[in-house]
Curated annotation (Swiss-Prot):
Source superkingdom: Bacteria
Keywords for the protein's UniProt record, in alphabetical order: Lipopolysaccharide biosynthesis
Full protein name: Colanic acid biosynthesis protein WcaM
Record NCBIfam families: PRK10123.1 (NF007517), WcaM (TIGR04004)
Transmembrane portions of the chain: none
Pathway assigned to this chain's UniProt record: Slime biogenesis; slime polysaccharide biosynthesis
One of the GO BP terms on file: lipopolysaccharide biosynthetic process
This protein's record includes keyword DNA repair: no
């Protein structure tokens, strides 16, 4: 109604409404349950999202709708939700910051391109999104430099492709207690699908039920191109709790076409289980400086690796914690069970299973291992070594199927050898070449107790 036609009755009614807006009842009116972002100014999405979050509990980006040029930070208020059915796009500098109780959810067709989700609170949820874009270093960032405790993080059902890192956690300054990262598909990445870095304060972390495909770092970055990586801080052979990444499970992972699938540095109290790997070879991330292995463990204590199936892939590396050529720690106290590696149809030799283990009070248990056209290699000497139900075949032109290098007396790494109350226990262990002949190399046996049953090779005479 034009102002010049305003009647006295209309004017009085409007005046009464203005007075009502100043009453306590009016100020207490809650935000609407949901608002639609396409009802706001399309020429300034930053201001529009800020206004929308102030007016609604959930801000919806409708299907088929595109919000572009999101190139700065937007804070999602505590307890509020961004629900994406359309598309949000930026140039790599934009981010949505999640605070306590914030959620970013998606539906079919909902996605983000070149925008980062920055987690800075407890009880946050990121779910049901497609994410992509090489603009930002990572699609989801969890960390920051402020000291805080963040609890109950949920990341579920994401599809992340054609990006650098998918999920990056920098954990030195803060703590996460309880994180579930589940049911995602990661493909065509330059960086890691999940990197949980210097996460020495975190606990109760579950990373499970993911598909990882085609991770190939071609941009020259060092240490990029891992499927799932977790790391503590400085290696220490005493394995102090406050320097290790710990209390986590990595489970139900299907991975293919990358250089390294699972990676742990300076970790303890963890489980890796139910891994299915194909084509984990050196053809990927050739200049990234990372070892080729389905599972790579460096300087770790008290862990379990169980039910790993690998085909045409490099197997497992369990090795020293090394910095600048200095051997700082050796793996100890772990179980490796139910491992299958079949490289029968691979055109070239790859790592089978290489294990370095030791320390004065330590154990290693290797059980139910079957490998074809791959070698099992043991280096250094843990206090107690148990090997059960192991069948290994390697071609004679490559080397022995089973090698045990216990004698490290002339090696700088001999400092990690166990020397007191040592035990070697072997049962149902068979190592052969392609002709079915025994294929074993053992340098020296001087264990205090040796128990042997059903093996296809002779042990060297015991020497002090």
């Amino acid at each position: 109604m034009p102002f010049k036609t305003l009647s006295r009755r209309t004017f009085l009614t409007a005046s009464s409404a203005l007075a009502f807006l100043h009453t306590p009842f009016a100020r207490a009116l809650p935000a609407r349950q949901s608002v639609n972002i396409n009802d706001y100014n399309p020429h300034d999405w930053i201001a529009s999202f800020k206004q929308a979050f102030s007016e609604g509990q959930t801000v919806v980006v409708p299907a088929g709708f595109v919000c572009d040029n999101i190139n700065t930070g937007i804070f999602i208020p505590p307890g509020k939700t961004l629900h994406i059915l359309g598309s949000l796009r930026g140039n790599g500098r934009g981010r949505f910051v999640l605070q306590d109780g914030s959620q970013v959810t998606g539906g079919e067709g909902g996605g983000m391109h070149n925008i980062t989700l920055d987690v800075r609170g407890s009880d946050c949820t990121i779910k049901g999104l497609a994410m992509s874009g090489f603009g930002p270093v990572m699609q989801i960032y969890i960390g920051g430099k402020n000291k805080r405790v963040m609890r109950n993080l949920t990341i579920d059902n994401l599809t992340v492709s054609h990006a650098n890192y998918a999920i990056l956690r920098q954990g030195f300054h803060n703590q996460i207690i309880g994180a579930n990262i589940t049911n995602c598909k990661f493909s065509d990445l330059q960086g890691d699908a999940i990197e949980w870095n210097v996460a020495i304060n975190d606990s109760d972390i579950l990373i499970s039920d993911h598909v990882i495909e085609r991770i190939n770092c071609t941009n020259g970055k060092i240490n990029w191109g891992i499927g799932i990586g977790l790391a503590g801080s400085t290696y220490d052979n005493n394995y102090p709790e406050d320097q290790a990444v710990k209390n986590f499970v990595v489970a139900n992972i299907t991975g293919s076409d990358c250089r390294q699938l699972i990676h742990v540095e300076n970790g303890k109290h963890f489980v890796i289980r139910n891994i299915n790997a194909r084509n984990i070879t050196p053809d990927f991330s050739k200049k990234a400086g990372i070892d080729n292995a389905t599972v790579a463990i460096y300087g770790c204590d008290n862990f379990v690796i169980d039910n790993i199936e690998m085909i045409n892939s490099a197997g497992m590396l369990i090795g020293y914690g090394v910095i600048k050529g200095k051997y700082l720690s050796i793996p100890q106290n772990f179980r490796v069970n139910n491992i299958q590696l079949d490289n029968t149809h691979l055109a070239y030799k790859l790592r089978g299973i290489q294990i370095s283990a030791g320390n004065a009070v330590s154990f290693v248990s290797l059980t139910n291992i079957e490998m074809k056209r791959a070698s099992l290699e043991l280096h250094n000497k843990p206090q107690h070594l148990f090997m059960r139900n192991i069948n290994v075949m390697q071609e004679s032109s490559v080397g022995p199927a089973l090698s045990m290098n216990f004698d490290m007396r002339k090696d700088v790494r001999g400092v990690f050898m166990a020397k007191k109350e040592t035990l070697l226990s072997l049962a149902n262990v068979h190592a052969v070449n392609e002709r079915g002949q025994s294929s074993v190399d053992i340098d020296r046996i001087n264990h205090h107790i040796v128990n042997v049953e059903k093996i296809n090779f002779r042990l060297p005479e015991r020497r002090e």
